[in-house]
Amino acid sequence: MRLVQLSRHSIAFPSPEGALREPNGLLALGGDLSPARLLMAYQHGIFPWFSPGDPILWWSPDPRAVLWPEKFHLSRSMKRFHNASPYRVTLNYAFDRVIDGCANHRDEGTWITRGIEEAYRRLHELGHAHSIEVWRDRELVGGMYGVSQGALFCGESMFSRQENASKTALLVFCAEFIRHGGKLIDCQVLNSHTASLGAIEIPRRDYLDHLAALRQQPLASRFWVPRTLFLPRK
């Protein structure tokens, strides 16, 4: 299998089945981060992931990490915390601040480059990328963002500045997503944090089948309209 060099003059991608086994899922390099190319990528189970100074790299790993929202794992300690939660959770109130928080919360660096931030801000302006914000009073203490594909949500990154803030974002989002027809959350690559919340690995082929079906299923009307999803317990 060869790594494919993308053309700037075409937004077409090779089949994900041609991705490398090592490193797992690396499919192509180059191209750009235009909205049209990014949307084409997500529609085919592909996402960008690269470090500052590297070329744009495109991935479709096998297996794929996913979370069925109804299978979110709510631990006893998290349930106790949430029942007395000090947090307010909103949808699409502060996308720029959320992606900036995701880019800057890791001491060891981040894959969210300036170019990535600008590209996903454009997707947000076009109605394809969305954020969930967690607030304590007026302070943004956590959140997550991703890209919508019908009844499937492609989670990109999350951050937390206070206890259980990112868990709260995902917990509240899962409940709201289910109520409005959401079926599956793409977590891309499994890690210990997402695994602890209920994410599992499935074969890439199965993920692509789910994607093809779910991206044709719309969520309830006006689901992505900015609004408050959860208020702190009194």
UniProtKB/Swiss-Prot annotation:
One of its GO terms (cellular component) is cytoplasm. It catalyses: N-terminal L-lysyl-[protein] + L-leucyl-tRNA(Leu) = N-terminal L-leucyl-L-lysyl-[protein] + tRNA(Leu) + H(+); N-terminal L-arginyl-[protein] + L-leucyl-tRNA(Leu) = N-terminal L-leucyl-L-arginyl-[protein] + tRNA(Leu) + H(+); L-phenylalanyl-tRNA(Phe) + an N-terminal L-alpha-aminoacyl-[protein] = an N-terminal L-phenylalanyl-L-alpha-aminoacyl-[protein] + tRNA(Phe). It is found in: Cytoplasm. It comes from the Bacteria. Its EC number is 2.3.2.6. One of its GO terms (molecular function) is leucyl-tRNA--protein transferase activity. The keyword Zinc-finger does not apply. GO terms for biological process: protein catabolic process. Keywords: Acyltransferase, Cytoplasm, Transferase. Functions in the N-end rule pathway of protein degradation where it conjugates Leu, Phe and, less efficiently, Met from aminoacyl-tRNAs to the N-termini of proteins containing an N-terminal arginine or lysine. Belongs to the L/F-transferase family. This is Leucyl/phenylalanyl-tRNA--protein transferase. It comes from Salmonella paratyphi B (strain ATCC BAA-1250 / SPB7). The gene is aat.
